[in-house]
Amino acid sequence: MKRVVITVVELALTVVASAKVENGGIDAKMMEQLRKGYTASPEQKAVKNALASTPINTLATNGENLAMCDTHFSHRVKTSGITNQKSSGRCWLFTGLNVLRAKMINKHNLGTMEFSQNYCSFYDLLEKSNLFLQAIIDTHNLPLEDRKVDWLLHNPIGDGGQFTGVSNLVMKYGIVPKEVMPETYQSNNTRQMRTILSLKLREYALALRATDKKLLATKKVEMLTEIYRILVECLGVPPTEFEWTLRDRSGKALSTERYTPKSFYEKFIGEDLEGNYIMVMNDPTREYGKVYEIEYDRHVYDGENWLYINLPIERIKEMAIASIKDNTAMYFSCDVGKYLNRDKGTLDLANFDYESLFRTSFPMSKRERVQTFASGSSHAMTLIAVDLTAEGAPRKWMVENSWGAQSGYKGNLIITDEWFNEYMFRLVVERKYVPEDILKMLNQKPIMLPAWDPMFAPEE
């Protein structure tokens, strides 16, 4: 067992952090004051009684905003069909594949089709397992209490992610149609599988930390062999070759050929996802015009961390509008749980009036919400439409979601421009829609941020 050495500074900080302040607790006098502060007026009794048996959002629903929203959009990307991630955290994968799906449908005049999310999920979990194990090897000499090691052990594997995962996986492994590797129960319901994998990876982490350095590489392969077996049993064997028939919208067969996953991607998409797409973000806690890189912000160890250009929201809107006008969908992420009316399928600051219900205010700005972990990117969807005024200003936006066709507005969510300002965080846009002055920002040396930065939780 390694001897733990505590420095004088660390000890002093521990003492300060644990020191109790006199009168810092809730004593009888304070409790009496709190009780007196609550006056059971008829209004307060009514609210208390209602909250005892009714969801908060039901009571906070803004009655003046109940009318169905306008579903007209001046510009909309042509899409077909709605996907469903079910009980999994794979929104990032569904969204990225939906961006590619729209391209294939429009390019080849196809009906509804999907790429296999399960195929990509298999390699995503295998690559994340390798990323974790190799990171444990790379931090072999650090103490278990080190912040980086601590973060790794808290986050061994999950099925959340972002566009980096799509670009890494598709460029390395290709894609296949959904019918070639369909979903399984475990791919649709990932919680228990994630628990099993996490438990195994944490066990392996301790074993690797106790292994001689000369044996680490061999040991890792043995561990990944076991992980591979578990993934096969949960998700199936990924195909290395398959036969597929291309059909038009009417169902007429156009061609039947044999493909590998990579040759299929090259024939029907063929883009360099790692070089042709730019990720921009709106993070008001950081300086605009700077490029940021997040440690371990990738799904593949031998891939590259994604780079984010931090921009004012209006610059991001310019690129989004240009892309939609050119019939090109985008990867979009936001804090979807805020002011979401699931029945109407709207994201609108006027959906709920929490202030009136609780007779208080919630004045924090977007910057303050991010700083205090009150908000951040939580879900990815496909940005497909914008409604512009005669002057070209956006009124509202629409995203294609991955919660099934019965969710929201025909499987989509309609976003007011005011909500977009407050809760939109990231957009992945093709390079050709990015102004030259923004592209030049990529020449900067990126500012490296730690993996636990509050802005960069995986989208689920």
Per-segment meaning from a language model:
Residues 77-89, 151-157, 302-310, 319-320, ...:
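Second-shell loop/turn segments in exported
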Residues 93, 119-122, 168, 177-180, ...:
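Structural recognition of the beta-strand scaffold that forms the well-ordered cores
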Residues 21-22, 215-460:
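Active-site signature of cysteine proteases
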Residues 21-81:
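N-terminal regions that are enriched for targeting/export leaders
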Residues 1-22:
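Bacterial Sec-dependent N-terminal signal peptides
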Residues 69-139:
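Post-signal peptide N-terminal segment of secreted/secretory-pathway proteins
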Residues 117-246:
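Papain-like cysteine protease catalytic cores
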Residues 87, 95-96, 100, 162-171, ...:
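Stable alpha-helical elements in mature extracytoplasmic
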